[in-house]
Design a protein with these regions (language model features):
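C-terminal single-pass membrane-anchor helix
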Residues: 134-168
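Cationic, beta-structured binding surfaces that engage anionic biopolymers and membranes
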Residues: 1-139
């Protein structure tokens, strides 16, 4: 498998696909996912990080805020990864040895499709593939919301200034 992508045909239950499908790696809901017949409980807080548990045992943890910062440390069943923002839109994922294992982007419908592209044919365990895909999607969504809020705030201030100038 060279990449994973998200099928958002059903908005409330996006599916994580191996490449463009049809193989489904997981079906996600707001607070849970079904991965390989197992239920993952999901908790994501953009200001704090994200955690996935399976049977009460933590399997995925993003230690850093998803909304801001240039690095997000991720632990998946004891294996360490770091998501590094090369630019505000382009990210790479390095393993504990600093080797690039994957990349993702916000460009070209990146938030909707959230493609996680691996360095060649990946040999990562399924838990790592799904965990990295989930955290990368949460990171992209958190940053999209942050950017949208900044635009709304700027437009509100500019509208108030324009109204004040017009009335005076």
């Amino acid at each position: 498998m060279h990449y994973v992508s998200w099928d958002r045909t059903e908005r409330d239950t996006p599916k994580l696909l191996a490449e463009a499908g049809p193989e489904v790696l997981g079906v996600f809901q707001e607070n849970r996912a079904s991965v390989n017949g197992e239920i993952w409980e999901l908790t994501a807080a953009p200001e704090v990080g994200a955690v996935a548990t399976r049977g009460g045992e933590e399997i995925v943890r993003a230690y850093d805020p998803l909304r801001r910062g240039e690095r997000v440390r991720v632990d998946i069943e004891g294996r360490e990864y770091t998501m590094v923002g090369e630019t505000s839109r382009n990210w790479v994922i390095d393993d504990a040895d600093g080797n690039k294992v994957a990349q993702f982007t916000r460009e070209n419908s990146g938030v909707r499709k959230a493609i996680l592209e691996f360095e060649g044919e990946t040999s990562l365990p399924l838990t790592d593939i799904v965990g990295l895909a989930w955290v990368s999607r949460e990171l992209l969504e958190a940053r999209q919301v942050g950017a949208a809020n900044a635009v709304i705030a700027t437009l509100t201030v500019l509208s108030a200034v324009a109204l004040a100038v017009f009335l005076l």
